């Protein structure tokens, strides 16, 4: 998907079966549906090793991989195929990780599109700086407390699935209640803990919303003790973690989160329009409508009575 940001679908020689079987929620496949007609180069997915034989059959000039867990795996694939293997990274966080900029720079160099790579890196910096500039000077005591639930962790999960040091909250300098645990990355919390925190605003990943809704039907009493539920302060964000991060969607989510938490600082932002601006700048085409069709888009969630 990083290569898709170069807006040249004809550079691809093959596609993994996993991409064809699970296209939902992947903006790069909405933007370039023709990619699903490419020859299959293996099963794909995080648990399958690359299929050297099938890769060889499509005669690529270079193999980009993000799932080579170590140098040895990349070297082995290069040895088997005789084709240069280049290892890229999405980094550790969902947005604005320096490793992404490094990866884009490397791709640009290899495919002869260094100018586009520079433009992409500059765009990432621009979004990061804009989000930070809007929010960094807001005093802590003026910020609502926030919580994100329903985050995917190798599959969809309910409201207890969250993150400490959550990069989208960090992008808008939000007060993440989970940060007081000192834990980072994916965390499963107890419902009792959520009642204790009682965050002002709750965000739910749309991919996890069905699990949250099921749980709500079973445990209405728990949900109804939460202030955010009582006051209608539950909001849906678009899922961005399908077979690693869709950076475009994550940035769009960060703008929506900013708008919900600090309406004054984001007065000029219409989240749907901003999402399409981001998709257009990175992928070359607006795909928010398709994401919204699949997941319901950015919205306030009203739990049934």
Where are these regions (language model features)?
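A short, structured surface patch at a secondary-structure boundary
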Residues: 1-57, 62, 67, 177
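Periplasmic-binding protein-like
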Residues: 63-66, 201-205
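Alpha-helical scaffolding within the catalytic cores
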Residues: 72, 91, 133, 187-193, ...
